[in-house]
């Protein structure tokens, strides 16, 4: 959800949600041949899975510009890496029904602002790295008498792949789409484990973020009467919001699959300068790579990172305990409580809104909101959200509770920061006294050499003449620069090339105090960075934790002119951040209303799909909790709006430095000073640290795109586009691919589309023949069954197939007749509980003591403790871990009687119609949506002749908060219309 460190926080607080993936590996024979994994065999993880969803951008990015190995040489090598990675993930999960591959398409306007910030930062860093490389080459040549080996020159000068190309509408995304279609068809023809799969490919031409296209599919299938409520889902991706999205489906058999980003295999890490194993950039000597074998064919490469499961079902168990409130005047509903928890997480961070100043996940911001919610739930009379809609009156109660604590939160934060700073200085002084100033002496006590300190960022110096020509070639970085403790962020953020250049520069300034060439006397400054490419929460970025920002001294942090811990902070905040008169209170309330509108948009996006493609939050900063006034009077509604075309999004999010990804006709708009939109593409932009210490945490103050002005400029160039470019600017469709191994579906499609009896060019799938898949398929013009399958790229890295046994058709999701409901479906069988009574009691006792954490480290909880993790106990299948032990359901609140496992009433039948499209200030009552789940009194089973519907029990009082459950069990609306 855009929450920095959210995954780490969740996995630490709720340790049993994590377990390691058991993975079969291909068998390598003595002659070097490989026997692939037989995925037709049972899954070694002890459970079979139906559907696997790949958020493909989480695969494409690490494959195209990896952190732990040399980058692929070209796009074809990248595609081969994507194939290998995808194959590995599919082999782990072994889906038996559906594989969905979703690539990010055009995003809603609300997401474009975040994309714009990331891409501008990325381009700025790439430009600085390129400048560093050019200066490094010049200095290396000077050091080596004007000569550099070909291999060393290639290592330094190779132009890095521009990751901004991984955006809809670029040629790279066309190549990716063609390659993925080929790969899936190839696997359907050649791999028995894939033969019966139905593969849905939603490439970058289909609008929407990848994970949200996946969720739209899950919701569409869930609304079908033929949906199996015990479908087992796995979604792969690196974003923490996948966890929230998994919860929001209310499908209990849901797992998130991801790499264990905490795992660090030091031996496998590669040097960023020379590309060799066994050392990092700080210890690089600049030596040429030693080949393992005549052609380096014996190089074993990098060890594979392990993968981990995140069990949404276990997280639901934890939340059932944590969110339980005893003695409620209405029935506790876990499904609604989980939705409220997701809503509260939105305040701490998401991809569309800045987090509230008082809330940081590292400071237990979610705990703070949860406590307020639990304290007020009985008096609110019901839940804050319903199926993605917000009860604004109840939301006001939560915000008022936070506002009362806001001043103390800021003061407590300052006290904690001061204590940390004091402890740091104390330890630093202790180290200096003890002679432990860090590696190689460290920068904590720089020596004066020849009467001066190192002018480059206070780095330690060596005496003049200390190095001979022989020594110059064997220097390591740590002899000159200690990046991990550098007081300036611009040192810690430097590329490997810039660090090596700084080393050479420092050395040269000592050994040659009077250079002959005047140009050498004042080389350009390095690392004057206003932005960092380190993304929030990206724990895979090296040294992310050590990146600091420019400061007035090594001891002082950046100046904070808002000073949230002092009286008058609100006036200073709006004056400094919004440039508004501190007396303009109505403006503050307007910002609060815009933020509430954003919360309404985000929640609908998570639960129902995109409510508006054009809405966005028009500020860089969030309001204070005290600025949310009278929000219950708001009437929020959204217009669906227009979806941007790919080139329009590219022009919205790309900097001019990445214009190569756009057709040339647009370049002038980004470069010409007379362009009507030149102000959208600043080369330099401010990063506001906003009270933070690390550059990657700062706010990029880029101008917001004025869409009417941009559209007028971009659309004026459309007539100049070539036919190929125009095709890249069009919207595409989802594709369904399957093979003759899926006999019933294969025969039906061939009969209706390609036989003498063929009829209409589209038809509705029969779930009995498609193994449960609902939707409509349409014939692809120009597609001929049983034709040749051609590899689409130039070097023929993969074979052609003379006879393609797969079929490809367009696919449309089924249109639901109602909104997605926050309920468990009839017939669902909940997984075996993972939490024991001791786990539950531990959580409750901590909550009663006001504790913040999940479990003590001294307890044996059966949680995962894989390589690189710091958890309480080693995961063990026999310790009562996920789905293994004889645990129990968490006890219900005191006022309720928990049902036995498998009790009926998990929400029956087709849900009622959607609520209105607008928000109103009338509060929701509790007659609606008291769907059954963990720890609820479900009431008696439906009578045999009763119409299905929500299980309600009680009189459904019209008074707010007094109804004890759902709609009437008679299966009718209040106006007597039957809903089935």
Curated annotation (Swiss-Prot):
A zinc finger (CCHC-type) spans 269-286. Residues 503-514, 535-554 have a biased composition (Polar residues). Residues 111-133, 413-461, 491-560, 845-980 are annotated as: Disordered. GO terms for biological process: DNA-templated transcription termination; mRNA processing; nuclear-transcribed mRNA catabolic process; rRNA processing. GO terms for cellular component: nucleus. PROSITE patterns: ZF_CCHC. One of its GO terms (molecular function) is 5'-3' RNA exonuclease activity. Residues 890-903 have a biased composition (Pro residues). It is an enzyme of class 3 (hydrolase). It is found in: Nucleus. Pfam families: XRN_M, XRN_N. Residues 413-424, 952-962 have a biased composition (Basic and acidic residues). Its main location: nucleus. Keywords: Coiled coil, Exonuclease, Hydrolase, Metal-binding, mRNA processing, Nuclease, Nucleus, rRNA processing, Transcription, Transcription regulation, Transcription termination, Zinc, Zinc-finger. CDD domains: PIN_XRN1-2-like (cd18673). Interacts with RAI1; the interaction is direct, stabilizes RAT1 protein structure and may stimulate its exoribonuclease activity. The interaction also stimulates RAI1 pyrophosphohydrolase activity, probably by recruiting it to mRNA substrates. Possesses 5'->3' exoribonuclease activity. Required for the processing of nuclear mRNA and rRNA precursors. May promote the termination of transcription by RNA polymerase II. Essential for vegetative cell growth and chromosome segregation. Belongs to the 5'-3' exonuclease family. XRN2/RAT1 subfamily. This is 5'-3' exoribonuclease 2. The lineage of its organism: Eukaryota, Fungi, Dikarya, Ascomycota, Pezizomycotina.
